């Protein structure tokens, strides 16, 4: 049986990342960083093992999200299209060995429904949907 392949593409199509296999974590996040990264009320993040990345194509740029604690390593390194600015993926110190991919950038096949919501204490008060069967943390 062949493993499922997911491909995330930026808005202009110049950059992409391809991974094999299902995500290790598939979550909605309500933290301020994800809200700012997406320009939305939450971020959809699919985390895959680093070894599952099979291809990255395009002229990427990076932005390092600094820690608020002096001398501490950066929180995240975000990787985005150098042409249109779409954030496609990132590496986070909190998820060693995993690469986070923006769920909304994956078109076909469609990612399964997120199974968890995190940082719920920062969720917008008007946002009332519930993920059926999902665990909720923080």
Positions of predicted regions on the chain:
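A short Gly-Trp-Pro
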Residues: 1-9, 14-138
């Amino acid at each position: 049986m062949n493993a499922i392949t997911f491909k995330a593409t930026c808005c202009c199509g110049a950059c992409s990342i391809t991974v094999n296999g299902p995500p290790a974590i598939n979550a909605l996040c309500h933290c301020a960083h994800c809200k700012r990264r997406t320009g939305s009320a939450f971020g959809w993040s699919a985390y895959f093992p680093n070894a599952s990345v099979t291809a990255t194509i395009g002229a990427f740029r990076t932005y390092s999200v600094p820690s608020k604690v002096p001398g501490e390593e950066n929180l995240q390194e975000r990787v985005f299209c150098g042409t249109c600015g779409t954030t496609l993926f990132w590496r986070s110190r909190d998820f060693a060995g995993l690469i986070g991919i923006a769920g909304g950038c994956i078109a076909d096949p469609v990612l399964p429904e997120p199974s968890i919501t995190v940082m719920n204490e920062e969720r917008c008060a008007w946002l009332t949907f519930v993920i059926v069967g999902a665990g909720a943390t923080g």
